[in-house]
Amino acid sequence: GVTVVFEKEGFDTETSNGEMILSMICATAQEESLSISKNLKWGIRKRMQDGTYLNGMSPFGYEKQESQLIPIEREAEIVRYIYSSFLVGVGTVQIAEELNRRYPKENGTWYVSAVRRILMNEKYIGDVHHQKNFTPDDLPLLCQKNSGQLPQYYVQNHHKALVSRQEFEKVQTLLKRKGTELIFRVFLW
């Protein structure tokens, strides 16, 4: 096998003492890593409760400055267009097509899924919902929906809204209704 000599620490893995010391150092490092991780998560959850936490990416229509979401007016106009179009009966497919004509993206295409995400995102009424999803501590580290495994935090009026609460709630009702109609249509045909 391969022997590793740690000159600074004064041991090598060829001896049983060296292997034992290496095992102890590894176990200590693992515990230290877990402790740091728990402390970081505690700090993040505390900031979620206080309403001062913002996760990595800003939603379309906003930019992050320090711990604030600030509207980007050109993008905010597009968000308002999406909501107003949907509220007058334009479907998500047609909205995406019109966005691609009127407001082409620099880095790609407007898809129906992006339109739906904007229509369903509470950030556009100025609210933040933390821990809707989470990544568990154990392997595999795959993001999953939070179905009560961790506390969720909902902060109202966290930042400037791009659409009214009334518009948002009406859109949610319409989305649910359209989803139900689609399910029935699939079963009928």
Q: Model-flagged regions — what are they?
A:
Residues G1-E7, F11-L22, C26-W189:
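Conserved catalytic breakage-reunion loop centered on the nucleophilic residue
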